[in-house]
């Protein structure tokens, strides 16, 4: 039986007894994840942040597993096309399998335009992998909020909620389960999230206080917020009635990649 960390039941028992840092190292050094084998035959998949790193490698595996159509959602279309060519070369897939669509998670207008295109141009949507995110040690704002909160939290869930009806429609039409999966991080464990103590309705104002900004804590906080929001949405949209699986995954420690 696989645990949420990809480990056996015995490994999971060991992990539960360890402090966070030790359990993290244990997973990194001793837990070997199985290669994916689930077929994506006939499925349409969207992966955001798919021109590099985790998004690129996830996209490559999805194509290897037989996806009929994969949308590479990228801020930079030119880099997205280079990624598509790389995937074609390594997998031998048909060029018609891959599409590159522009998506800038720092812009609500771009997020809304992307979602509108999905509803207009895609007959179905089986899997949405929300992988795009940023990690910065410098304070900056997008859409009047701190950048990591805008990109990693608000835009992510705006897009997820806009695409949810398409996932639900596909599940009902084809009598299967669809997926909304968010790339989170083990770093949520170390989030201080002191802004949660702000008065009602003032959390975002507190997060915009540059004098109290810490890059590493803000990134960890954004990942904690992802997990908390996924739990809330999953509770409001039970799998039994809608057949849309909503979850988070943690990739562990991976090498950084430039965007």
Protein language model regions, located:
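Rossmann-fold NAD(P)H-dependent dehydrogenase/reductase core
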Residues: 20, 25-258
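Cytosolic, low-complexity regulatory segments enriched in Ser/Pro/Gly with interspersed Lys/Arg
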Residues: 1-19
């Amino acid at each position: 039986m696989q645990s949420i960390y990809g480990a056996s039941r015995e490994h999971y028992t060991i992990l539960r007894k360890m402090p966070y840092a030790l359990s993290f190292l244990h997973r990194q050094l001793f837990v070997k994840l199985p290669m994916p084998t689930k077929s994506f035959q006939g499925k349409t998949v969207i992966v955001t942040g798919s021109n590099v790193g985790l998004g690129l490698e996830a996209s490559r595996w999805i194509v290897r597993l037989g996806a009929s159509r994969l949308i590479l959602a990228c801020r930079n279309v030119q880099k997205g096309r280079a990624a598509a060519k790389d995937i074609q070369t390594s997998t031998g897939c048909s060029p018609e399998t891959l599409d590159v669509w522009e998506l800038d998670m720092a812009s609500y207008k771009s997020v809304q335009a992307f979602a509108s295109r999905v509803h207009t141009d895609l007959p179905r949507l089986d899997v949405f992998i929300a992988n795009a995110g940023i990690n910065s040690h410098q304070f900056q704002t997008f859409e009047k909020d701190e950048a990591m909160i805008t990109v990693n939290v608000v835009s992510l869930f705006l897009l997820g909620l806009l695409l949810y009806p398409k996932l639900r429609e596909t599940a009902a039409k084809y009598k299967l389960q669809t997926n909304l999966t968010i790339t989170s991080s083990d770093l949520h464990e170390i989030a201080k999230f002191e802004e949660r103590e702000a008065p009602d309705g003032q959390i975002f104002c507190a997060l915009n206080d540059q004098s109290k900004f810490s890059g590493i804590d803000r990134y960890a906080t954004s990942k904690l917020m992802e997990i908390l929001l996924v739990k809330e949405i999953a509770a409001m949209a039970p799998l039994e009635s809608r057949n849309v699986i909503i979850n988070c995954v943690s990739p562990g420690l991976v090498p950084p990649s430039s965007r």
